[in-house]
């Protein structure tokens, strides 16, 4: 199943003082909806507040995407009207952009000039009078349903090779499992002012890996879980957070705490706890921060593990941390 993430934000040009009425710097006098499409684990739709778009077009688009085996999650919690700097940064960083134009006159050439970094730009026109190349695109499609279906078909082709969820690293003879950052529970990860999501590309196959970049938090908490049924019984594994800290990182004078809990089928638990300094890793490449080790139990007694990294020193403003995910891998 191909999966992709989409961020939808309604921008309204001119007038009004409400949270959804702002001046758009990208397209003058244009009502439009931008989807910033980056490599994520689900199709995440931040709904427009405009009734016609959110209840009409998007409600139609959702089942069409699902029929094309693209998972959909509707998010109605997106911050609107404020803090748009992060939104435009995500648009600039994205490899695929899907723009929905509605009830306005606009020039598609302007959008392309402001999104030159994208590999693909896919437009959807909804009650719009178009000029320039956009008019030719609009007139080439007989109806909105055909246009949406063609856009979905293009997305499916472009995203066929995206790996999502818990996956096994594709290294030779590797039995390492990875829980990506998107699968972790992270404090304030849904807030753009606190975290920015982006994609990196790694060899050997240049697959896109989504990472979370910390802008600012005072209370840090990251946790996730994994089931040992996927592991080789009797093998000793380490559980490590894969992180990096850029040169501008701050607020890491105090150590972070880590723990690994294994919950057995009979309800008994084992807990490992430790602390370590992240400050000494500032400016380095990816580093492994170990949460603990375990020996995989027999599959008929498979257990669930949970892993956590936290630091609750609220007087420290923490920034600069980049999180790739958590690796569970055999120890040498």
Curated annotation (Swiss-Prot):
Pfam families found in the cross-reference section: PP2, TIR
GO terms classed as biological process: signal transduction
GO molecular-function term, one example from the UniProt record: carbohydrate binding
InterPro entries: PP2-like, PP2-like/Lectin, TIR_dom, Toll_tir_struct_dom_sf
Limits of the TIR domain: 38-163
Name the UniProt record assigns to this protein: Uncharacterized protein PHLOEM PROTEIN 2-LIKE A7
Natural source organism: Arabidopsis thaliana (Mouse-ear cress)
Gene (UniProt): PP2A7
């Amino acid at each position: 199943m191909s999966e992709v993430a989409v961020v939808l934000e309604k921008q309204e040009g001119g007038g009004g003082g409400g949270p959804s009425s702002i001046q758009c710097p990208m397209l003058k006098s244009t009502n439009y909806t931008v989807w910033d499409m980056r490599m994520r684990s689900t199709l995440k739709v931040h709904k427009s507040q405009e009734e016609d778009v959110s209840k009409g077009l998007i409600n139609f688009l959702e089942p069409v995407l699902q029929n094309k085996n693209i998972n959909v999650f509707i998010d109605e919690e997106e911050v609107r009207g404020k803090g748009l700097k992060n939104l435009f940064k995500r648009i600039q960083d994205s490899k695929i952009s899907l723009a929905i134009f509605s009830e306005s006159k606009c020039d598609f050439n302007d959008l392309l000039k402001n999104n030159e970094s994208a590999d693909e730009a896919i437009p959807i026109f909804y009650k719009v009078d178009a000029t320039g190349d956009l008019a030719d695109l609009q007139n080439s499609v007989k109806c909105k349903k055909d246009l949406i279906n063609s856009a979905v078909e293009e997305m499916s082709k472009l995203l066929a090779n995206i790996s999502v969820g818990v996956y096994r690293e594709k290294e030779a003879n590797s039995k390492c499992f990875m829980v990506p950052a998107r699968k972790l529970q992270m404090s304030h990860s849904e807030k753009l002012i606190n975290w920015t999501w982006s994609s990196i590309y790694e060899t050997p196959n240049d697959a896109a890996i989504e990472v979370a970049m910390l802008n600012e938090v005072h209370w840090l908490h990251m946790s996730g879980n994994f089931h040992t049924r996927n592991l080789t019984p009797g093998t000793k594994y380490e559980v490590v957070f894969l992180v990096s800290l850029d040169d501008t990182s701050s607020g890491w004078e105090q150590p972070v705490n880590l723990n690994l809990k294994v919950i057995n089928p009979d309800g008994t638990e084992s807990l490992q706890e430790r602390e370590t300094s992240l400050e000494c890793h500032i400016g380095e490449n990816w580093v492994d921060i170990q949460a603990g080790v375990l020996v995989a139990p027999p599959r008929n007694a498979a257990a669930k593990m949970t892993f956590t990294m936290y630091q609750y020193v609220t007087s420290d403003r923490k920034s600069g941390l980049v999180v790739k995910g958590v690796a569970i891998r055999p120890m040498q």
